[in-house]
């Protein structure tokens, strides 16, 4: 039977090696996701943990892998401590690769084989590219079934391209180029040509036996076709802004639906302000706020999102009261147990955690950051907060972080609403 791809078409199989393994051979397989994230990226330094749309790059694929629920284990192979910390924070295990497979000349297969040899319990490895932030759980779920249910030995992701290719000739030479996949006398229209399948590099599933032979694609092999909008790869800095826009539209943001956010809880010190209290010559205490942050709060309120300000530092209480009056938002202060107080508010408002957005900045916020449907911290927040948030702002506290997070909430709400409208369309009517 031919494999089914994302577009509902049949994927072609290749039995050329005759190494097909029956899915009945073993009732249970250990399937691992393996994300390669070397610290010495030449194109973009520490690219794998650079923030993309508020999430470390590897965070996008780790989240997709974990939420797919098809893997017995999800690993990040790295030689860098900071990458390891981020991987653990996002729910992956860490494989500390050896110096021998951490060189510029080391291939992905070298690293995968090292992992395979050190983890004998693993039967199938899915090498997921860290630079594919638009990967969704459903892509992995559907692809793994080609191995577990249809008996394929290796599966890799592809995208359909409609590019006309020409033979390369030496510069300065007098040789004529020739077409490689078209007849210029009968140039096809796009709609009349099915295009060509090209690897998009998102993932490669392979059984352990193939990997030990030095192959990621072999035996009874097939492809999984992904739509172009999900086929994003990042190699150089110039790709970053383009990828960010693509991710905001087509990326996977987790199981919780952002359109249900009804309440934003926002710290005053360390989020709305930069955490500093200024003293005038006359002894008056002052703080500064960014007008963009005030506008951001107004934008949320206009869209029906309630905003409550939080302040835990007694010295800043009077200033926080003045800010809450200026913002037109309720203020909660003197909280010995922030989590308990937030849950009390949720009961009063009849809300669940998935309906709450939380902007925090310190250790006292960690539990709320973890539980909130959408959470964020300013870029200058302490590491303990950065490691437990779903979104990290590009802007610092008191310098536009609140406005940025507000825009992120509204963008996800718009994205989800658009998807809901698309889901209501009756495709049979076309």
Curated annotation (Swiss-Prot):
Grouped into one coarse class, the protein's main location is nucleus
User: Carries keyword Flavoprotein?
Assistant: no
Q: Which reactions is this enzyme annotated as catalysing?
A: an N-acylneuraminate + CTP = a CMP-N-acyl-beta-neuraminate + diphosphate
Organism (species): Danio rerio
* Superkingdom assignment: Eukaryota
Tell me one GO biological process term.
N-acetylneuraminate metabolic process
Catalytic site: 187
- What GO molecular-function term can you cite, just one? N-acylneuraminate cytidylyltransferase activity
Output this protein's name.
N-acylneuraminate cytidylyltransferase A
């Amino acid at each position: 039977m031919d494999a089914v791809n994302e577009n509902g078409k049949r994927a072609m199989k290749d039995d050329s090696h005759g190494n097909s393994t029956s899915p009945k051979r073993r009732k249970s397989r250990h399937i691992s996701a393996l994300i390669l994230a070397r610290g010495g990226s030449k194109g973009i330094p520490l690219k794998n943990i650079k923030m993309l749309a508020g999430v470390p790059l590897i965070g996008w694929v780790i989240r997709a892998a974990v939420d797919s629920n098809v893997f017995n284990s999800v690993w990040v192979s790295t030689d860098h401590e900071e990458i390891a910390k981020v991987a653990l924070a996002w729910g992956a295990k860490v494989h500390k690769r050896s110096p021998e497979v951490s060189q510029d000349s080391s291939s992905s297969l070298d690293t995968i084989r090292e992992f395979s040899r050190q983890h004998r319990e693993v039967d199938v490895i899915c090498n997921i590219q860290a630079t594919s932030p638009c990967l969704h759980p459903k892509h992995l779920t559907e692809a793994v079934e080609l191995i577990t249910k249809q008996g394929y030995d290796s599966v890799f992701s592809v995208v359909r391209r409609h590019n006309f290719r020409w033979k390369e000739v030496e510069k300065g030479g007098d040789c004529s180029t020739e077409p490689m996949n078209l007849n210029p006398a009968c140039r096809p229209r796009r709609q009349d040509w099915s295009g060509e399948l090209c690897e998009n590099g998102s993932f490669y599933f392979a059984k352990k036996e193939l990997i030990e032979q030095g192959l990621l694609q072999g035996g009874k092999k097939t492809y999984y076709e992904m739509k172009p909008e999900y086929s994003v790869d990042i190699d150089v800095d110039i790709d970053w802004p383009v990828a960010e826009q693509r991710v905001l539209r087509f990326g996977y943001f987790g199981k919780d639906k952002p359109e249900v956010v009804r309440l934003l809880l926002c710290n005053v010190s360390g989020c709305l302000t930069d955490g500093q209290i200024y003293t005038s010559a006359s002894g008056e205490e002052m703080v500064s706020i960014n007008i963009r942050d005030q506008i951001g709060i107004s934008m949320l309120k206009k869209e029906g999102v309630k905003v409550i300000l939080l302040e835990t530092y007694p010295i800043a209480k009077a200033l926080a009261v003045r800010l809450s009056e200026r913002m037109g938002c309720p203020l909660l202060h003197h909280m010995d147990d922030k989590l308990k107080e937030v849950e009390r508010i949720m009961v009063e408002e009849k809300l669940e955690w998935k309906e709450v957005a939380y902007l925090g900045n310190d250790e006292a916020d960690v539990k709320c950051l973890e539980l909130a449907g959408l959470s964020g911290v300013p870029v200058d927040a302490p590491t303990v907060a950065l490691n437990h948030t779903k979104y990290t702002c590009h802007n610092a506290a008191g310098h536009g972080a609140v406005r940025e997070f507000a825009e992120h909430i509204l963008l996800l709400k718009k994205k989800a609403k658009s998807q809901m409208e698309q889901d209501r369309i009756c495709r049979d009517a076309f």
